[in-house]
């Protein structure tokens, strides 16, 4: 594949894709906005603690590779960034809303089951049922310009196989973990995490509104 993103590049692009859909009033993002999104504790695996300089380096690299572009002027006091990774005017990668939601969630959290993906991607796209999730994953795995996802071997204690994106190269299956704590129902855990994410997004919007009113 022509896409070879590092872990940090995947995090930055995933954040911009996410915020473009979930908080369009705050998009494009400033450097500080990208830092906050990258280090967010909800809907991130692993949780990171990136500095502004580390994030700026990734942004500069991604702009050079034409995956992002800068937006300035027209009243913007600071440079902001928007993604050109997919669905851009002159870009080759075209994804449906359902595909964007799944790819974004995989970029932000790594390998996940269809049930986990359905719950965690719900803020970006509301899948009608599990069949739609599985069909979308199958389409991503079999695209002529792909594949963009791969199904991994099922882990012990899990009802579903996990899927992983291929924008960072081929994926090696992780060794099976036999700890019974890993057999917890992933769907329930994902639903709890989805609620936590929704609360965090609402708090972020409230803080932004209060800051705007205070100006």
Swiss-Prot record:
Keywords: Acetylation
UniProt-listed HAMAP family: UPF0502
Domain of life: Bacteria
NCBIfam families xrefs: PRK11239.1
Protein name: UPF0502 protein YceH
Gene3D superfamilies to which the protein is assigned, alphabetical: Winged helix-like DNA-binding domain superfamily/Winged helix DNA-binding domain
Positions of post-translational N6-acetyllysine modification: 80
Listed SUPFAM superfamilies: Winged helix' DNA-binding domain
Family to which this protein belongs: Belongs to the UPF0502 family.
